[in-house]
Amino acid sequence: MSSIDITEKHPSINIFKLNNAYYFKHFFDDPELFNELEPYYEKANYRFKMTNAGARNKVMKLLDMKGFDPNLIEDAAPYPVEIGKYQNYGELLKNSIESYPLRDKVVLVMKDMVWVKQALEMGAMLKTH
């Protein structure tokens, strides 16, 4: 009898290259996996940061072995949105990799295209260079 692989793939996780480091955001409900990734966790920003390609490769391999689909994003151009700094953007902030102020707006690099779309529905605009 042939065996069928019924391993369920978890969601894809985008790993962004920004400013010579690699970042991703994901909530893991597997405490064992989180403990393995904990050395890379930036608690203040609720994200994971790898400072070099070797660490990134190690994390991507671990995520893949745990059933996730890690995707390296070297061009983050489609992911930034901007929203007025006085608008309610807390939910967007929780689902962004990076954020910074820009005049009367806040620029957010969203963690995936689902959240880019959500941000646009909440009144954000795509950030153009």
Residue ranges and their predicted role:
Residues 1-129:
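Accessory DNA-engaging acidic/polar modules
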